[in-house]
């Protein structure tokens, strides 16, 4: 069991910013097309984080609206395919899983910004 924890600790990424559900983020993902590798940016609102950040199995779900259609993508937090994560805006939400955000459209889909004091 200790060997597994040691192996997980080696694969953990320490360069990731602290973010939570409701935050607007830009996820820079490495995509391999043939022999070329490029970076694609997926920008949206974090709906949930799964398994926190202590485990290599930690994931987070990001939702964006593209041409009027909602697109959700689940990213492994410690994946080597993620180049970097930028927090664009901190959101003020009361729940840790904001699934109700899927049903909202227009101005109702706005999330208030968390102010730093």
UniProtKB/Swiss-Prot annotation:
One GO CC term on file: cytosolic large ribosomal subunit
Transmembrane segments: none
Transferase in keyword set: no
Keywords: Ribonucleoprotein, Ribosomal protein
GO biological process, one term: translation
Pfam families with a match to the protein in the record: Ribosomal_L19
An example molecular function term from Gene Ontology annotations: structural constituent of ribosome
Function text: This protein is located at the 30S-50S ribosomal subunit interface and may play a role in the structure and function of the aminoacyl-tRNA binding site.
Family: Belongs to the bacterial ribosomal protein bL19 family.
Protein name, UniProt field: Large ribosomal subunit protein bL19
Species of origin: Desulfosudis oleivorans (strain DSM 6200 / JCM 39069 / Hxd3) (Desulfococcus oleovorans)
Native organism taxonomy: Bacteria, Pseudomonadati, Thermodesulfobacteriota, Desulfobacteria, Desulfobacterales
